[in-house]
Swiss-Prot record:
This is Hemagglutinin. The lineage of its organism: Viruses, Riboviria, Orthornavirae, Negarnaviricota, Polyploviricotina. Its main location: virion. Binds to sialic acid-containing receptors on the cell surface, bringing about the attachment of the virus particle to the cell. This attachment induces virion internalization of about two third of the virus particles through clathrin-dependent endocytosis and about one third through a clathrin- and caveolin-independent pathway. Plays a major role in the determination of host range restriction and virulence. Class I viral fusion protein. GO terms for cellular component: host cell plasma membrane; membrane; viral envelope; virion membrane. Major glycoprotein, comprises over 80% of the envelope proteins present in virus particle.
Length: 83
Protein backbone atom coordinates (compact mmCIF):
# COMPACT_ATOMS: atom_id res chain seq x y z
CA UNK A 1 0.00 0.00 0.00
CA UNK A 2 2.82 2.38 0.89
CA UNK A 3 4.58 1.66 -2.41
CA UNK A 4 1.40 2.41 -4.34
CA UNK A 5 0.92 5.71 -2.49
CA UNK A 6 4.55 6.67 -3.08
CA UNK A 7 4.27 5.80 -6.78
CA UNK A 8 1.07 7.88 -7.15
CA UNK A 9 2.71 10.85 -5.39
CA UNK A 10 5.74 10.69 -7.71
CA UNK A 11 3.52 10.57 -10.81
CA UNK A 12 1.48 13.56 -9.60
CA UNK A 13 4.64 15.57 -8.89
CA UNK A 14 6.05 14.82 -12.34
CA UNK A 15 2.84 15.98 -14.05
CA UNK A 16 2.40 19.04 -11.80
CA UNK A 17 4.98 21.17 -13.62
CA UNK A 18 3.20 21.11 -17.01
CA UNK A 19 1.16 24.06 -18.25
CA UNK A 20 -1.44 23.58 -20.96
CA UNK A 21 -2.10 26.51 -23.29
CA UNK A 22 -5.19 26.31 -25.46
CA UNK A 23 -7.64 28.46 -27.36
CA UNK A 24 -11.35 28.87 -26.74
CA UNK A 25 -13.45 28.50 -29.85
CA UNK A 26 -15.76 31.46 -30.34
CA UNK A 27 -17.07 33.95 -32.90
CA UNK A 28 -14.84 36.82 -31.76
CA UNK A 29 -13.00 38.90 -34.34
CA UNK A 30 -10.53 40.38 -31.83
CA UNK A 31 -6.99 39.46 -32.82
CA UNK A 32 -3.92 40.26 -30.74
CA UNK A 33 -0.18 39.77 -31.03
CA UNK A 34 1.32 37.74 -28.19
CA UNK A 35 4.94 37.17 -27.28
CA UNK A 36 5.09 33.89 -29.18
CA UNK A 37 2.39 34.31 -31.88
CA UNK A 38 0.80 37.00 -34.06
CA UNK A 39 -2.90 37.45 -34.93
CA UNK A 40 -4.29 35.17 -32.22
CA UNK A 41 -8.09 35.28 -31.93
CA UNK A 42 -9.19 36.04 -28.36
CA UNK A 43 -12.55 36.18 -26.59
CA UNK A 44 -12.11 39.81 -25.51
CA UNK A 45 -9.31 42.35 -25.40
CA UNK A 46 -8.61 45.75 -23.85
CA UNK A 47 -6.08 48.17 -25.35
CA UNK A 48 -3.77 49.17 -22.50
CA UNK A 49 -1.11 51.04 -24.47
CA UNK A 50 -1.94 54.68 -25.18
CA UNK A 51 -1.69 55.51 -28.86
CA UNK A 52 -2.43 59.24 -28.59
CA UNK A 53 -1.01 61.96 -26.38
CA UNK A 54 -2.13 65.52 -25.70
CA UNK A 55 1.45 66.78 -25.79
CA UNK A 56 1.49 68.00 -22.20
CA UNK A 57 3.04 66.26 -19.22
CA UNK A 58 1.71 66.69 -15.68
CA UNK A 59 4.03 67.39 -12.79
CA UNK A 60 3.68 65.13 -9.75
CA UNK A 61 4.45 66.66 -6.36
CA UNK A 62 6.12 69.57 -8.14
CA UNK A 63 8.53 67.35 -10.13
CA UNK A 64 8.43 67.44 -13.92
CA UNK A 65 8.42 64.04 -15.65
CA UNK A 66 11.29 62.89 -17.84
CA UNK A 67 10.43 62.82 -21.54
CA UNK A 68 11.92 59.61 -22.92
CA UNK A 69 11.40 60.58 -26.60
CA UNK A 70 12.88 58.09 -29.03
CA UNK A 71 14.70 55.04 -27.69
CA UNK A 72 17.48 56.78 -25.77
CA UNK A 73 19.56 55.02 -23.13
CA UNK A 74 17.21 56.36 -20.43
CA UNK A 75 14.26 55.03 -22.43
CA UNK A 76 15.71 51.53 -22.41
CA UNK A 77 16.49 51.65 -18.69
CA UNK A 78 13.16 53.18 -17.63
CA UNK A 79 11.06 51.03 -19.95
CA UNK A 80 9.89 53.31 -22.76
CA UNK A 81 7.20 51.24 -24.54
CA UNK A 82 8.42 52.47 -27.94
CA UNK A 83 11.81 50.81 -27.47
Amino acid sequence: MEKLLLFATIILCVKADEICIGYLSNNSTDKVDTIIENNVTVTSSVELLETEHTGSFCSINGKQPTSLRDCSFAGWILGNPQC
